[in-house]
Structures are given as C-alpha cells and as structure tokens.
UniProtKB/Swiss-Prot annotation:
One of its GO terms (cellular component) is cytosol. InterPro entries: Trm112-like. This is UPF0434 protein GOX0764. The lineage of its organism: Bacteria, Pseudomonadati, Pseudomonadota, Alphaproteobacteria, Acetobacterales. Belongs to the UPF0434 family. Pfam families: Trm112p.
Amino acid sequence: MTTELDPRLLSLLVCPVTKGPLTYDRETQELISPRAKLAFPIRDGIPIMLPEEARQIDA
C-alpha cells in the first residue's frame, strides 16, 4: 500500500546527516538524501529519519 507524503511535512524535513533537502520516492516509500546517498524508509506513513535505518543508494 502506498500512501502520499504531505508536501508540507517534506518541506520541513531535512537529512539528519547533511541537513540538506530530501526528495520523496513514492514507488519505494522512501525519503532520499542525494548528498548523503541515503534512503530513509517511511513506515505506516511515518518517516524513519535514523541514519542506522537508512539504506545506501547509488544515486
């Protein structure tokens, strides 16, 4: 099940590692930090912003 992330919430959140902006990947239900090359999961509509919960990405 995919849920939409409120754009207002996305505008408030930053990467906990770089403090940079995040993008929302609807398909994978993750918040992407291009600078840190991390993908933070969204579980039950709640972004999990812990670096140890993120996965490395190649982007």
